Amino acid sequence: MNNNIEQKWDKVLEDIVDYVIGFDVEGNSKEAMETAFLALFDTIGCGFLGLKSTGCTKLMGPTIPDTRIPGGCRVPGTDYQLNPIEAAFNIGCMNRWLDFNDCWLANEWGHPSDNISAIIAAAEYISNDNISKSKKPLLMKDILCAMVKCYEIQGVLALDNSFNKIGLDHVILVKIASTAVTCHLLGGSRIQILNALSNAFIDGHPLRTYRHSPNTGSRKGWAAGDAASRAVQLSLMAMAGEMGYPTCLSAPKWGFYHVYMSDKPFQFNQRSNYSTYVMENILFKVLYPAEFHGQTAIECAIQLHPIFQDKGGLNSVESITIETTEPAIRIIDKRGILRNPSDRDHCLQFIVSVALIFGELKSSHYEDQVAIKDTRIDLLREKITCIENLQFSLDYLNPDKRSIANSITILFKDGETHKHQIDYPIGHRNRRSEAIPLLQQKFLNSLNSTLFTSSSIDQIKNLYENPSKFNNLSILDFMSIFSLSIASTPIS
C-alpha cells in the first residue's frame, strides 16, 4: 500500500497551491498588473545589458554547442531556440548578471524578477504545444498574472523567514515560487502542482558562499537562472506523473524544518495570506547597478559629490561615516581586497567611493580598468567606516515603513562636516511616480546595446507605449518581437 495516499499535505504547500490556482490577480489589483508590466520590461532590459558581458554570454546557449530546437523556446536579444529548461537558465542568467533587476528586502532578501525566466520559458513551451493541438496560446496578461503570483510567494515567505541566517541562498525561493507557478502554467492539476512543489522544497539548495568574502564570485550572476531552470524541470517531471512528498516540510528527522530550521516551522506574522502585496511594493533598481541595501547611500554620495569636489576631493577628507541597516552591515560592509566585479558591486565602501569621486555609478566602474587603475577608489575606501543605525534597522523591518535608509557624514581635514540622509530609494513604492519615467528611459537605453534593427526597436517601443495592446498579445508573438532571428516580423 502507498502510505502517501493517506498522508495530509503540509498546509504551507496547500496554501501556495490554492493561491496559484484560485486567486484572480487581474480582478483584484490594477496596480499589481501595471507594476508587473513595468517589472517585465525592466527585467528584459537588464537582460539586454547583461548580454554585453562575456562573463555572462559564455554561459549561455544550448548545453550541446550549435544545437537548435525548431520551434523551441527563445531567449530575448539572441537567436537561440532551446528546450524550456535551458531557456529558463539562459534568460535568468542574462537578466540577473549585472545586479540591476528589482529587489525585495525583508528577513530574507532576493529578486522576485528572477522568476520571469521560468515563466517565459514555460509559457512559450506550453503555448507552442497548444498551437500544435489547435488550442490558444497564453497571452501576455497571463504572464503578468503569473509574475504577480511568483513575486507574492517569494516575498511573503521572505517576510518573516531568514534563509540567509542558516546559510542558504535566497534563490531557494525562486525555485519554490517558479515551480508552483510554472507547473500551473503547464496545465498541472492541484496534485501535480503539490507534487512539483514538494520536490522543490526537498531539493538541494545553494549556500551563500559565492556572495560573501573571501569567495564572492560570478555564480551570484547565474544562481537565479539555475534555480529557475530547476523549477521548470521539476514542473515537467510532475506533469509526466512524478510523485510528491506530502510532509516534506514537517516530517520528523528528514523534513525541511528539522534538517534546516531546528524543527521551527515557517512564520507568517506580517502576512498570513497571499494576494498582490509584494508586486505592489517591489523595489526597482532605477539608476544604479548595485546591491539594494546601498541604493540610498549612492544617492547620498551623489548629492555630496559637488561638495566633495569643491573641497578638494580625496586629499581633503579626514574620515567618512556611513550609518546603515543591520542587513547592509552583514552583506555589503567589506574591507580588504575586492577580487572581481561581483565583489565590488556588493561593497558599500566601494560604491560610495565611486559615487563621491565620479558623481555617478555604472557597471563599468566595477571592471578592473577603473576599479584597480584608479587608485583613488581604494584610498577613499580606507577612510570609510560603516556603523549600524538601530532606528534604520527597525524601520527597515517595520511593515508600515519598509525604509532602506543610509546616511553619509564626511569630516573634512579643515574640521568642516557635511551629512546627507535618504530613507527611501527612488525604486521604493513611496517614490513610484518619480521612478516610472526613469524606468522607461532605463529600458529604452538598454535597447541601444542590442543587435535589433531600427525597425525592430521601433516595434518594441510601440509595444511598451501601448499596454492595452500588450495585454492581449500572445507570448509567441511577444517572443517573436524580442528574438533576433525574427525580430523584424510584423505583429498584426
Swiss-Prot record:
Transmembrane segments: none annotated. The keyword Lyase applies. GO terms for biological process: propionate metabolic process, methylcitrate cycle. The keyword Lyase applies. Pathway: Organic acid metabolism; propanoate degradation. GO terms for molecular function: 2 iron, 2 sulfur cluster binding; 2-methylcitrate dehydratase activity. Keywords: Lyase. It comes from the Eukaryota. It catalyses: (2S,3S)-2-methylcitrate = 2-methyl-cis-aconitate + H2O. Its EC number is 4.2.1.79. Belongs to the PrpD family. Catalyzes the stereospecific dehydration of (2S,3S)-2-methylcitrate (2-MC) to yield the cis isomer of 2-methyl-aconitate. This is Probable 2-methylcitrate dehydratase. The gene is prpD.
